[in-house]
Amino acid sequence: MAGRELSHLQQLEAESIQIIREVAAEFDNPVMLYSIGKDSSVMLHLARKAFYPGKIPFPLLHVDTGWKFKEMIAFRDAQAKKFGFELLTHTNPEGVAQGINPFDHGSAKHTDIMKTQGLKQALNQYGFDAAFGGARRDEEKSRAKERVYSFRDRHHRWDPKNQRPELWRTYNGAVNKGESIRVFPLSNWTELDIWQYIYQENIELVPLYFAAERPVVERGGQLIMADDERMKLEEGETIKHEVVRFRTLGCYPLTAAMHSQADNLEKIIEEMLLTRSSERQGRLIDSDQSASMEQKKRQGYF
């Protein structure tokens, strides 16, 4: 009797679960990076499936810059309580002591100190030798050339010219002492795949992904949400209430919203079928300088 043919989403799911299980078996101290966004939510769902009915055998790590949306932090804590996974959080204490913030220090310095350096501190503190991330190849050109097993040196730096071939989905996890890998189980997924899988599996998401009336400021052609009293208005700016949603999430002063009426999953998927723009157009950190994402990754970014 012929086996049942898997659908496109089932094939992606099976591939991701196999990668997660392989890393859990092969590495001594893996961790899953949890940014609280839609891709992290899908990756968490896949990890739960991979080890069901047991618990996820590694912790989740959130590098908290102190500038995430309030709804993201509330959602993070609710998910940890609901599913009972081990949640680690880390904030760069040196950055906090220096008062680093995206308004006074700019996106490049804020991202480097609070995200990149904060991540490296946490990885060193706990001695993780493999870190799962939710990046996808369709997101951005530097991520398009990254391997599923992305090797990092003892300083967590990425050298795109010094990576291993992954023929026939065979992964080489051998690392020298002090080295590590970043693992991307969602590498072959697209943004549309993610949304269709969320719909199929009924995965919970931060409400910010759905259209609602929110307080925003128009700055440089982008809509920035005034999430708390720390929002610094520039001359001539006023806060307006408009119906918007977020296609991608990060630190609130560095993440732009978009006008949208998509307040449920069906409408978001319909919107995705029609859009021709990149989901990362709302991430202000990507416009710091030419090839900024690749430079950040070379320095140890997610």
Curated annotation (Swiss-Prot):
Q: Which GO terms describe its biological process?
A: hydrogen sulfide biosynthetic process; sulfate assimilation
Task: Write down the EC number.
Answer: 2.7.7.4
Under InterPro entries, the record lists: PAPS_reduct_dom, Rossmann-like_a/b/a_fold, SO4_adenylTrfase_ssu, Sulfate_adenylyltrnsfr_sub2
Name the pathway it acts in.
Sulfur metabolism; hydrogen sulfide biosynthesis; sulfite from sulfate: step 1/3
- What general EC class does the enzyme of this chain belong to? transferase
Q: Which UniProt keywords are listed?
A: ATP-binding, Nucleotide-binding, Nucleotidyltransferase, Transferase
Q: Which Pfam families match?
A: PAPS_reduct (PF01507)
Nucleotide-binding as UniProt keyword = yes
Does Nucleotide-binding show up as a keyword for this record?
yes
What are the disulphide bonds in this sequence?
none
Region described as Disordered: spans on this chain: 280-302
* Reaction(s) catalysed by this chain's protein: sulfate + ATP + H(+) = adenosine 5'-phosphosulfate + diphosphate
Tell me one GO molecular function of this protein. ATP binding
Span of the signal peptide: none
Q: How does it assemble?
A: Heterodimer composed of CysD, the smaller subunit, and CysN.
Per its database record, what is this protein's job? Answer: With CysN forms the ATP sulfurylase (ATPS) that catalyzes the adenylation of sulfate producing adenosine 5'-phosphosulfate (APS) and diphosphate, the first enzymatic step in sulfur assimilation pathway. APS synthesis involves the formation of a high-energy phosphoric-sulfuric acid anhydride bond driven by GTP hydrolysis by CysN coupled to ATP hydrolysis by CysD.
Family classification? Belongs to the PAPS reductase family. CysD subfamily.
Entry-linked NCBIfam families: CysD, PRK05253.1, PRK12563.1
- Give the protein's recorded name: Sulfate adenylyltransferase subunit 2
User: What organism is recorded for this protein?
Assistant: Shewanella sp. (strain ANA-3)
Gene encoding it?
Answer: cysD
